[in-house]
Swiss-Prot record:
This is Gamma-2-syntrophin. Residues 73-156 form the PDZ domain. The gene is Sntg2. Coiled coil: none annotated. The association with dystrophin or related proteins probably leaves the PDZ domain available to recruit proteins to the membrane.
């Protein structure tokens, strides 16, 4: 794994150029796993701020050969010491072609400068061996005489079980650079049946012969703007071990990228997520320039929503959430045009929803249940995901979401809080129809005044209390709520009982206004109630 510096941009006004942090390119080797074929092969990843690129090794001609010539024909002169100077693996019995697995430095194969580890052997002295077994190719090479002509083509997607070395690109390579393969190497550096005893001239490149070089070539570039990451096998709740997949907005996928350790996977997950978040933030800033102050996007991004099947089975599906203006939106795909904002699967008023952190991992073996808002009914969150939150909406509707990182959970928590507080202050008050003992009443929650109840017909105020006077509440979970207020003069508790068509929306609204009021008076207190952010800061 490495990071390569790229050219730095001009320094922003007010910042010295020597303090400018250059853009960085992150690279690493990984396995690209084909879940259908259950096969994997080596790739190199290249991560920039905007793109994740998949690279595969290939042998390219750097001069002396017609463009597009993929096959190379090389004549080897067998040497008394070292033979052909190479080893091979594979064969038809393993479902792969015979490939060169080792090239020994300064011996016959190395001296040609035209053969590479990973080359598939296609012909030996004009005999096609593409479907030959390992032993058949070994026998043919050992008995091919002093001069052996082989035709090869680089195998770009060599199965990982071949354990071919991936050292510095070039003809020579340290044959001990990787773990051994279950397929043995047949060493052809030993002498075959030579007809002479005098030392043979080495296999040297001819001046006008084509020159080749092994390089990492870009094969797929996945744009990260509005992209999402998944660590789970599609359609299941099976967590891939040390693996992830990146899916672009247009549906393009990196495929399953398998890392050597869980730590490497976590490192790349964080790096890719950070770049996606940065690009999303840029998109939000551009969109907000065209929106009114009351219609700004506060936060948006991908999550996974838990869906309940008819047979009580549970599975998660990707959803795109957005907090904009007065609403919380749920989309099947990111909104990229003005019209898309009217095509949300769900839209809720921010004052009437309740955000709850449910759980996040403290370590590999322990998780913390975090009921962020005490005093309200707990919500069952039985799911296998690591970082979960729920959004409780009107009429008891609920949505459970998961994210890939604890940092994302903290960001969503803060974003919901900020968006809700902004909407409360913009709205100022909300009024709901209610009834008691057959009378139609109006109940108002006001950011400045607190609670007011007045007659729906005469508009006469029946009672009014400040937020600080609310000392408790209880409800039947359906339509009826009891609010307990303390009279400022008598210090006695007064009970006010009301009925609402959508009790959940009213309770959430009360909570939103009280939380916004507390935050306006003591912002530090609200931050102290954030379980997710508190854990992330301590860890």
């Amino acid at each position: 794994m490495s990071a390569e510096g790229s050219q730095s941009l001009a320094a922003p006004r007010g910042r010295p150029s020597h303090l400018l942090v250059p853009a960085r390119t992150k690279t690493a080797l990984a396995l690209l796993y084909d879940e259908g074929l259950e096969n994997a092969y080596d790739v190199r990843l290249k991560l920039t701020k905007e793109v994740l690129t998949i690279q595969k090794q290939d042998v390219v001609c750097i001069g002396g050969a017609p463009p597009g010539a993929n096959h190379r024909t090389v004549t080897l002169r067998r040497q008394p010491v070292g033979g052909l100077g190479l080893s091979i693996k594979g064969g038809a019995e393993h479902g792969v072609p015979v490939v060169i697995s080792k090239i020994f430095k300064d011996q016959a194969a190395d001296q040609t400068e035209m053969l590479f580890i990973g080359d598939a052997v296609l012909q030996v002295n004009g005999i096609n061996v593409e479907n030959a077994t390992h032993e058949e190719v070994v026998h043919l090479l050992r008995n091919a005489g002093d001069d052996v002509t082989i035709t090869v083509e680089y195998l770009r997607e060599a199965p990982s079980f071949l354990k071919l070395p991936l050292g510095s690109p070039g003809p020579s390579s340290d044959h001990s650079s990787r773990a051994s393969s279950p397929l043995f190497d047949s060493g052809l550096h030993l002498n075959g049946h030579c007809s002479h005893t005098a030392p043979s001239s080495p296999s040297s490149p001819i001046a006008n012969e084509p020159k080749y070089e092994k390089r990492w070539l870009d094969t797929l570039s996945v744009p990260l703007s509005m992209a999402r990451i998944s660590r789970y096998k599609a359609g299941t709740e099976k967590l891939r071990s040390s693996a992830l997949e990146v899916l672009a907005l247009d549906g393009a996928s990196t495929g399953v990228l398998q890392f050597s350790t869980a730590q490497d996977c976590a490192d790349w997950l964080r790096s890719i997520s950070t770049n996606i978040s940065d690009l999303t933030l840029q998109h939000m800033k551009m969109a907000n320039k065209c929106c009114s102050p009351c219609d700004q996007v506060v936060h948006m991004g991908w999550v996974n929503e838990r869906l309940q099947g008819a047979d009580n089975s549970q599975n998660f599906r990707p959803k795109f959430l957005a907090l904009r203006g007065s609403s919380f939106y749920i989309f099947g795909a990111p909104p990229v045009s003005t019209l898309d904002w009217g095509r949300a699967e769900r839209a809720y008023n921010l004052c009437e929803v309740l955000f709850k952190v449910h759980k996040f991992w403290l370590s590999d073996n322990y998780w913390l249940q975090a009921n962020l808002y005490l005093g309200l009914q707990d919500f069952d969150c039985e799911d296998p995901r690591s970082y979960c939150f729920s959004v409780l909406a009107n009429h008891g509707k609920s949505h459970i979401f998961s994210v890939e990182l604890g940092s994302e959970l903290a960001v969503w928590e803060k974003a919901f809080q900020r968006a809700t507080f902004m909407e409360v202050q913009r709205t100022g008050s909300k009024t709901y129809l209610c009834s008691w003992q057959g009378e139609t009443l109006c109940f108002t929650v006001d950011f400045a005044l607190g609670f007011t109840c007045f007659d729906g017909k005469t508009k006469n105020v029946l009672w009014r209390f400040k937020f600080s006077q609310l000392k408790g509440s209880s409800d039947d979970g359906k339509t009826r709520v009891k609010l307990l207020f303390q009279n400022l003069d008598t210090k006695q508790i007064e009970t006010k009982e009301l009925e609402f068509q959508d009790l959940t929306a009213v309770l959430h609204c009360i909570h939103s206004f009280i939380a916004a009021k507390v935050a306006s008076l003591d912002p530090v207190f609200m931050d102290s109630q954030s379980m997710a952010r508190r854990y992330l800061c301590s860890s």
